[in-house]
Amino acid sequence: MKVRPSVKKICDKCKVVRRRGVVRIICENPRHKQRQGN
């Protein structure tokens, strides 16, 4: 899980999901998991 100020899709399989106001990226590739933290 990468925590970044700005999250972006890395590949075509990446999806942007909002959970409890937190923007996350979920993907088949575990290295592409991201969470937005300011």
Curated annotation (Swiss-Prot):
Keyword check for Flavoprotein: no
Annotated disulfide bonds: none
InterPro entries linked: Ribosomal_bL36, Ribosomal_bL36_sp
Any one Gene Ontology cellular component term annotated for this protein: ribosome
Keyword line: Ribonucleoprotein, Ribosomal protein
GO biological process, one term: translation
SUPFAM superfamilies: Ribosomal protein L36
Pfam families: Ribosomal_L36
Transmembrane parts of this sequence: none
Molecular-function annotations in GO: structural constituent of ribosome
Keyword Phosphoprotein applies: no
Similarity comment: family membership: Belongs to the bacterial ribosomal protein bL36 family.
The protein, known as: Large ribosomal subunit protein bL36
